[in-house]
Amino acid sequence: MTSGELKRAKRAVRRRVLAARDATDPADRQRAGAAVAERVLALPEVVAATTVLAFSSFGSELSTLPLIDALVGRGVVVGLPVIVDGDLVGRSWRPGEPTTETWFGAHEPVGGDVIDPSAIDVIVTPAVAVDPAGRRVGYGGGFYDRFLPRTRADAFRVAVVLPEQLVREELPAGAFDLRVHAIVTPDEVIRCAP
């Protein structure tokens, strides 16, 4: 598949899956966030983690606040992504600390310490769509594709999604697209072999 074909294929997946996700009820997304948090918090990799890069959900994404609240309650250092000069950087954040809204709707910490990518034990990755093999289609900015190779090889990557975002067909992926190790929905945990 050429790079142009790959971009077109991913764009088609984004359109289809985002339409399905956008049609979900906001109250269901809040409940899904709590259920997903419970499942993620039980994963052995997360239980052992001291530093987690999460993300601040926006739009029709499931709520990540229950997960972030619980991690902070456990004493885990939680970071949120910040885009600096086109690159993703993790900055520490605790609920209640100030954030600023980005041009695409996500919230980034205003302050917070920069987290060394090698210190991150778990990366909670956003995804528009994922397949059972751990391939993910993001929003198209390539931020995580550039960031993930800078993390440790043993850093655990987990995608948290609504059931509508878990697709059964093989998603389009290029050589630079790193897979996630696990997918968590409100109903299940899928272990992948990236």
Role assignments for model-derived ranges:
Residues 1-8, 12, 19-23, 74, ...:
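Surface-exposed, charge/polar-rich loops and edge strands
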Residues 2-119:
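N-terminal active-site beta-alpha-beta segment that forms phosphate/nucleotide-binding
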Residues 58-60, 128-132:
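Short glycine-rich anion-binding loops that position phosphate/pyrophosphate groups of nucleotides
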Residues 140:
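Short polar/charged helix/loop
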